[in-house]
Curated annotation (Swiss-Prot):
This is Small ribosomal subunit protein uS7. Part of the 30S ribosomal subunit. Contacts proteins S9 and S11. It comes from the Bacteria. Keywords: Ribonucleoprotein, Ribosomal protein, RNA-binding, rRNA-binding, tRNA-binding. Gene3D superfamilies: Ribosomal protein S7 domain. GO terms for molecular function: rRNA binding; structural constituent of ribosome; tRNA binding. The lineage of its organism: Bacteria, Pseudomonadati, Aquificota, Aquificia, Aquificales. The keyword Nucleus does not apply. The keyword tRNA-binding applies. It comes from Hydrogenobaculum sp. (strain Y04AAS1). CDD domains: uS7_Bacteria. One of the primary rRNA binding proteins, it binds directly to 16S rRNA where it nucleates assembly of the head domain of the 30S subunit. Is located at the subunit interface close to the decoding center, probably blocks exit of the E-site tRNA. It holds the Pfam family Ribosomal_S7.
Length: 160
């Protein structure tokens, strides 16, 4: 634990094309091995494909998709007298966003293993479309998390 208080959060700068912090976070999550220009190409192409189909701006598309993927509740383990309980807690806003983006990207990467091999732009675009329509692996992950929190609601009094 730091002795000098909390470390301040780093300020994230918006991306160059859409001037959006959320798009920049998505680019950083898609990026592998420091290849940011490749990640930017993947994200911009995916967003433009979905935006074209829905006649919306790419940033609106991403915000709609994230709204359906962000979790409100999650469970955290809490040890009480030798037993570990899964205690449901509300997710803070910055963590909601981070988890939503992470689940979108993970679900897009998983698509390759199940449904033939096609490009990451296509997989990300398909996952964003599914998220907007409230289906797909990322939305399922959110629903599973909420179901787990609902099932363990009896341990809510162990909140810390």
């Amino acid at each position: 634990m730091p002795r000098k208080g909390r470390v301040p959060r780093r300020e994230i700068l918006p991306d160059a094309k859409y001037n959006s912090i959320i798009v920049h976070k998505l680019i950083n999550k898609v990026m592998k091995d420091g290849k940011k220009s490749t990640a930017e190409y993947i994200v911009y192409t995916a967003l433009e494909r979905v935006a074209e189909k829905l006649n919306l701006s790419p940033v609106e598309v991403l915000e709609k998709a994230l709204e359906n993927v962000k979790p409100v509740w999650e469970v955290r383990p809490r040890r009480v007298g030798g037993a570990t309980y899964q205690v449901p807690v509300e997710v803070e806003e910055h963590r909601r966003e981070s988890l939503g983006i992470k689940w979108l990207v993970d679900a897009a990467r998983e698509r390759a293993r199940h449904r033939g091999s096609y490009t990451m732009e296509e997989r990300l675009a398909a996952e964003i479309m599914d998220a907007i329509e409230n289906k797909g692996a990322a939305v399922k992950k959110k629903e599973d998390t909420h179901r787990m929190a609902e099932a363990n609601k009896v341990f809510a009094h162990f909140k810390w």
